[in-house]
């Protein structure tokens, strides 16, 4: 079977040091985590950045420092976030693209994050989506189409049809967000059936769903995402380190008779030109 690409999402926008001391929030911490995760089998790092108060930021200088330090220490594929959970302007969300990442996330729909108190609306208008897609296309940055539900996949296909995303496209199927598609085998099979025939896909399971979604993705021929962005626990009551989650994912894939790709092999699988 084809090799598995492991993406590490070490930081995200939510967990803070008060939640877990293991979440990396500074450029140096993120670069160190990137190095440790590459040693355990990761090929891609999905980068969110924080300011000095641990708040999510799209500041170019912070992303520039973080990306440069990751590249200095690793051969990982760098994927920057273009998240707009905090209601940022489109131009602000595009700032990380100036760091010339290999890939960038492109969320193709809006949803309520009802698991937070108070709840948050993650807004992605069609104008925002196409704005970011055009920026990525112009900069030769491969989008990772981030789908929190089935309709997000259809919007991703629409981008392909309009020439704003080149084929073969890559999708990240985020399962188990409170407000998104529930993390079940039936739902994962259904959403995969909506993908273009030549697309690649990865699966991210949120919280307790991370491990079972890892198993299902490997069995279905997909790739997997792990990390403290999605789940801060290794097991019930035991806080995880990012590199531990990568090591478990690598072991899991091996037990299911799929080897883990190197970063260069992942570049070939995803047809990255950078």
Regions found by a protein language model. Name each.
Residues 10-32, 81-90, 118-122, 144-146, ...:
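Active-site mouth loops of central-metabolism enzymes
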Residues 18, 43-65, 174-175, 179, ...:
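Glycine-rich, proline-tolerant flexible connector loops at the mouths of alpha/beta enzymes
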């Amino acid at each position: 079977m084809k090799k598995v690409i492991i993406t590490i999402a070490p930081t995200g926008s939510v967990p803070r040091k008060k939640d877990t001391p293991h979440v990396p929030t500074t450029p140096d911490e993120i670069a160190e985590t990137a190095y440790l995760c590459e040693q355990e089998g990761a090929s891609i790092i999905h980068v969110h950045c924080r300011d000095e108060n641990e708040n999510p930021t799209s500041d170019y200088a912070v992303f520039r420092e973080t990306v440069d330090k990751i590249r200095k220490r690793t051969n990982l594929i760098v994927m920057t976030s273009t998240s707009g959970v905090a209601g940022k302007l489109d131009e602000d969300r595009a700032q990380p693209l100036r760091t010339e990442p290999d890939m960038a996330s492109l969320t193709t729909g809006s949803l309520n994050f009802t698991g937070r108190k108070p709840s948050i609306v993650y807004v992605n208008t069609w104008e925002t989506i196409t704005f970011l897609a055009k920026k990525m296309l112009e900069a030769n940055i491969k989008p990772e189409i981030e789908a929190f539900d089935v309709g997000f996949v259809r919007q991703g296909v629409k981008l392909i049809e309009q020439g704003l995303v080149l084929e073969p496209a890559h999708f990240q199927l985020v399962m188990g967000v409170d407000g998104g598609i529930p993390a079940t085998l039936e739902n994962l099979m259904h959403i995969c059936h909506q993908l273009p025939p030549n697309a690649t896909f990865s699966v991210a399971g949120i919280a307790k769903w991370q491990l079972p979604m890892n198993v299902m993705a490997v069995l279905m021929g997909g790739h997997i995402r792990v990390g403290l962005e999605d789940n801060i626990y290794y097991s019930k009551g035991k806080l995880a380190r990012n590199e531990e989650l990568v090591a478990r994912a690598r072991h899991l894939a091996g037990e299911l008779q799929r080897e883990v790709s190197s970063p260069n092999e992942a570049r070939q699988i995803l047809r990255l030109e950078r």
